[in-house]
């Protein structure tokens, strides 16, 4: 498998960060074509002798997009329509990428990837703990949002004979009440 990165912003480049597949794993004339993925970001480029410095969010972005890349590159499926990230439902396609984000808040991992730009020293444990605490602040509300999305999905797909306004009924129920709309 192959993996390429284009990390820095430049004129004419669209914003955001993403992983894209250049080549998917498939069988061609009896031989396996190995997958190739590329990761594109828009981080601040190095200036002169000063390196590009990444925020915690930037590092999470790299790990997240690399999770998509791993999903694509490690596939064993040779049927093009379902190889790598192709044909994977949107909620499932995020699993490997969100899993990879967890490594950013792992002390052992952070010790290997963080170094002070001038001294070369690794991040102090106290600073790491503060970053984790800040990251986790309000995490309960993010979980509530995910539960709301899951509940919406369940309620929508449980209805075998939906009415014209089923979506609106479910949304109104989730937004303004707590009991099930059924």
PLM-predicted stretches and their roles:
Residues 48-59, 82-89:
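Alpha-helix N-cap/helix-initiation motif
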Residues 176-181:
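Conserved small/polar residues in nucleotide/adenosyl-binding loops
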Residues 142, 146-171:
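A glycine-rich beta-turn/hairpin centered on an aromatic-Pro dipeptide
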Residues 57-72:
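Active-site recognition of the HExxH zinc-binding catalytic motif
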Residues 1-54:
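Active-site-adjacent "gating/activation" loops or surface patches in catalytic cores
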Residues 72-150:
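Acidic/histidine-rich catalytic neighborhood
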Residues 9-11, 45-47, 76, 103-106, ...:
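Short loop/turn segments at secondary-structure transitions that flank enzyme active sites
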